[in-house]
Amino acid sequence: MTIKNPLPTLLFFLAPTFLMAQGKGIAPADLLKPLRDSWPTYNGDYTGRRYSALTQVNQSNVQHLTLAWMTRVTPGAGSGGGRGGGGFGGASNIIVGGEGPGDIAVGGGTIKASVLQVDGTLYFTMPDNAWAVDARDGRELWHYFWKTKGGTHIGNRGLAMWNNYLYMETPDNYLVSLDARTGKERWHKVIADLSQGYFSTPAPIVVGNHVLVGTGNDIDAPGFLQSFDPETGELQWKLYTVPMKAGDPGLETWASLDAARHGGGQTWIPGAYDPETKLYIFGTGNPTPAYTTGTRGDGDNLFTCALVAVNVDTGKMAWHFSTSPHDMHDYDSAQTPVLVDAMFNGKMRKLVLTAARNGYYFTLDRVTGERLVSAKYGLTTNWAKGLNKSGAPEHDPGKDATVAGSLVSPNSDGTTNWEPPAFSPDTGFFYVAEGNAYSIFYLTDVDPRGSMGLGGKEEVGVGTAGSYLSAIDYQTGKVAWRRPYYGNGGGGGLLTTAGKLLFAGDGAGNLVAHDSATGKPLWHTRIGGITNAPQTYMLDGRQYLIAATGDTIWAFVMY
């Protein structure tokens, strides 16, 4: 269903159509340009800053933002698929692919994807589904449906683009390439073993002639990052995030090789790329089992819960930094890092910034991995007893899960989670959604099926000290200001612009524009809970602001 608002007082429906997406696509070199009229990759550009140079919408006029259109999509393949027919306003032809039988019914979809905008077309996903819609009015141009073999349908975070080709991952672990103009499939390749519990949720990232692909898993299986040829889909290299053979670096931090080979460290969120060093920097997930040292020992369990830099041409690790050595609370460090070139101690430095799920913030030199700043940003974070000699937090054994229970903050959802942070070069602030919930962690398991790769744990939430939109000074790690989120919890990821604006959701379902220097709210509209982050682009001389909630994309402009 599509609703368009050509004037503030006029709404009308668009009839079903089948159209072709127009345009020349995105050349790999174009991904290196500053972010303005398009949004060609997961975070807009390779830096992860989610900062747009657009200024048409700014502090002086943001209150005039008005709904331009909204479009609601329906996943599945109509009567032949597993999830019902297409919605009003949908394309009349649905392209169907996949290796599954076509009759596996899975849960309804939510748009957790970052939406690409190239040549006036928006591209986005749900699990097993991809769409192209007109960026001017939300009309559906094509819809691709993947017949799944099964797997965990927890979400899909979007597409990558290379020339006129798109790439998506599926819950049953295929990398699928589509023609961006028609939605027709070019090829698909297996990227992980479904029988081993893997499921794939990230958006791929295209870097030159590499399609970088991560995966997820919640049982005792090793994490890895892979690179595929964008033309043929052939595997170029594979980097494991845990030691896999005798002599591998980091093996000494595990109880045994067998423990390391089943040690987790999944790669389920896209990273950031520095074209000058050819380093792709990404975060890794928790070790497994997550809540007990029974098999993994008392070491740091490298390279889980870490920032890792890999050379995209060779697939070799350049450096790593553990943000949660020997994690005991499922504090994945998979959050997208942010790359900035900025002053630090009077010198221009190439930096990487991250606010980890564990409640700690870090600034590192992204060329060498040298740790420059470590600071606690969570108001209630209590699981660590201080910093170790490398500047990483040292876990407090007294906060490990016990039979009697341990009161820990943050809970396993973290002080922040996967939703994207942002950075503004105008303010020097790193922005992040901050939650301060408490749980009691019990070393027990009341579910007879077990608890996946968690190692036996029951978690009981016992309240929160509040959720905030927080601004962190990257040079000190200190929180410059906090704005409370209204409603229940946080509100998705973030967007900053040269119009001195910071866009965010809140826990009450509002999309809010803030003063990026102070956090003061300047405008809001209620659209529901934002599932990824707001985005912006310029088209036909007008700046659009878009956000996804549930199965709907909303677009705003100034009238």
What are these regions (language model features)?
Residues 1-4:
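N-terminal secretory signal peptides that target proteins for export/translocation
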Residues 8-18:
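Bacterial N-terminal signal peptides
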Residues 23-78, 114-117, 139:
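Mature N-terminal segment immediately following signal peptide/propeptide cleavage
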Residues 39-43, 105-128, 151-175, 199-222, ...:
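Repeat-blade elements of multi-bladed beta-propeller folds
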Residues 52-58, 84-91, 446-448:
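Short Gly/aromatic-enriched secondary-structure transition segments
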Residues 63-74, 130-151, 162, 174-195, ...:
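Extracytoplasmic/lumenal domain signature
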Residues 78-107:
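Disordered, low-complexity segments in secreted/periplasmic proteins that are enriched in proline
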Residues 96-111, 121, 457-464:
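Intrinsically disordered, low-complexity acidic Ser/Thr-rich regulatory segments
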